[in-house]
Amino acid sequence: MKINTVLFDLDGTLINTNELIISSFLHTLHTYYPNQYKREDVLPFIGPSLHDTFSKIDESKVEELITSYRQFNHDHHDELVEEYETVYETVQELKKQGYKVGIVTTKARQTVEMGLKLSKLDEFFDVVVTIDDVEHVKPHPEPLQKALQLLDAKPEEALMVGDNHHDIVGGQNAGTKTAAVSWTLKGRAYLETYKPDFMLDKMSDLLLILSDMNRS
């Protein structure tokens, strides 16, 4: 089956928001729980929804913590977000070749749009599914299924690209092929345990993989 659709995670996959996310968590947690959290403590918080993460920390303050996080994240967004090499060129080429491309993210739409605008990727994506659009987040298949439906695409003709196990398992649950990115903060070996179909060392590897898949 040939691939005609590519779905991407956003944070840590298309744009480097790692420092923004870590700083947002540390700011929020230092505000409410001084001297209790270090950088390494917040790394596992990257991937799940803010609600899931903060519920485990203090269920009575979830909305307050989310508000604090999002305010800091918004205020410091443009200074802390960086690009990944070959991402822009790869997405541009996918569009040129006629692929359907979409984003499936556990982030709120407002900050998604900020990131896409800053990286100039906003012109390329036909569909962007955010946490605001679904009841269940990755690895539940709902966000991917919604994106595929909006793109009029079949799961067996789609590839999900991401930097977290939520992306890989989400793709598997939705019935797509999966590609993990080796630049994940979680480490290449960690993602390999979830058995993605492909591992990208840089985003442009995707073009070669798709070319090989669609030739066979």
Curated annotation (Swiss-Prot):
Alphabetical list of SUPFAM superfamilies matching this protein: HAD-like
Magnesium is among the record's keywords: yes
GO molecular function: inorganic diphosphate phosphatase activity; magnesium ion binding; phosphoglycolate phosphatase activity
Range of residues in the leader sequence: none
UniProt cofactor(s): Mg(2+)
InterPro entries the UniProt entry points to: HAD-like_hydrolase_sf, HAD-like_sf, HAD-SF_hydro_IA, HAD-SF_hydro_IIIA, HAD_2, HAD_sf, PGP-like_dom2, Pyrophosphatase_Ppax
CDD domains hit by this protein: HAD_PPase
Keyword Hydrolase: yes
UniProt entry keywords in alphabetical sequence: Hydrolase, Magnesium
EC number: 3.6.1.1
Role, per record: Hydrolyzes pyrophosphate formed during P-Ser-HPr dephosphorylation by HPrK/P. Might play a role in controlling the intracellular pyrophosphate pool.
Assigned protein family: Belongs to the HAD-like hydrolase superfamily. PpaX family.
Protein name: Pyrophosphatase PpaX
